[in-house]
Amino acid sequence: MTAKPLVRPGLAAYFIPVTRHDHHLHQGESLREAAKSRLTQRGEQWTDMRQAVFDALANFDKPASAYDIAEGVSKALGRRVAANSVYRILDLFVQSNLAMRVESANAYVANQHPGCLHDCIFLICDDCGQTTHIDDDSLSSGVREAAAKSGFSASRPVIEVRGKCGDCN
């Protein structure tokens, strides 16, 4: 399978489709509307602050920390926004599949296909920080099966592979 670049300009990530269903990748206003729809379907409100946090997150080229996002929201709103407020919103976004957390970097990326549920698999470049999100259900199901064989119930496998991207190689 070949990687197709995400459609949002400047995003240094690629998406590898899963064969069992189609993904609809969103960008710009479409991404915001898909996120809003997903959140409201879950019975949550799409507040101005949540929109500001989502917009700031979606504008980053690389995984962003809550502090980076708080700084972006503060500039956009013209007032200081605390990182702890952003963390709470990011937690909700992760639970709602609007964002994915890059555990090793304590950073987040917007999910460009919030209607699809997959375990997180990230390829992280040690040189430039480019983070590629891929969906490979065969890999993540293997992790879940191995965990189950050990009597462990995996709630959310996260796989992060560190190395060098094609640009830095």
Label each PLM-derived region with a short phrase:
Residues S65-R79:
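DNA-recognition alpha helix
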Residues V86-S96:
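Basic amphipathic alpha-helical segments that dock to polyanions
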Residues H21-F54:
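Short alpha-helical segments that sit at the start of domains
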Residues R38, D55-F60, G72:
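Short amphipathic alpha-helical elements of helix-turn-helix/winged-helix folds
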Residues P9-G10, Y14-P17:
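Short, positively charged and aromatic/hydrophobic N-terminal segments
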Residues W46-D48, N59-S65:
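Short capping segments at the starts of secondary-structure elements
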Residues V94-N169:
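Non-DNA-binding regulatory cores of transcription-related proteins
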